[in-house]
């Protein structure tokens, strides 16, 4: 069995689709932890809808995605923990396909399908919809089944990922000192690699990712650019150099 950690903030419609696909798409009954990062009332209707199939961790004040992920992980009851975002859609049989791809001392990334070109060469680019409200989940499941391959390679290091509960803790989880949710994932995957974990990717399970939800004003975009740069600066302060990304296998290094 797997414990799933889904942090959520202000996207109840996306969360609804995410949970529907996770619950209806699973082969076994897994633990699904929804970490509500503030704004419980905004998400209350969706949480009530799936209350018999999820565990809710309600953080009354917004603490940010990094802290929310760590708290969700600490509350996992199974030895394998799957970290996923609320703007993902789960494929059919995601749980048994992930478990069959997992090996001890590894981190298994599920491949993704995205509607627009990506920096990650392994992703499948197919526009199956940009609107969560009108998304055809059955059409996605049929498409995903047609392109899924029983293949695993060492090109992991992206979300969503499956990891042993203790392995996550051994590398210190996600560093909560980062000034935002950028770069911290690069550091996490780098720490996993440095600790001897194999960074795998399975093509047996392909999750849909909406990429960017919500309206972003030019001011917000500029603000995020500054925060992202601050995250790079924090990494350099901590490690003595800026992070490097290998575009061929997604490996993160100094």
Model regions and ranges:
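A short, conserved alpha-helix in the catalytic core of glycosyltransferases
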Residues: 156, 160-161, 167, 171, ...
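Glycine-rich, basic loop-to-helix element that forms the pyrophosphate-binding segment
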Residues: 59-76
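Short, acidic, metal-binding catalytic loop of nucleotide-sugar glycosyltransferases
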Residues: 21-29
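Conserved donor NDP-sugar-binding/catalytic core segment of glycosyltransferases
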Residues: 93-130
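A conserved acidic beta->alpha catalytic loop
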Residues: 36-45, 89
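Short beta-strand-to-loop acidic/aromatic patch adjacent to the donor-nucleotide binding site
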Residues: 78-89
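Active-site donor/metal-binding and catalytic loop motifs
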Residues: 179, 201-220
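A recurrent flexible, glycine/aromatic-enriched loop bordering the glycosyltransferase active site
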Residues: 142-163
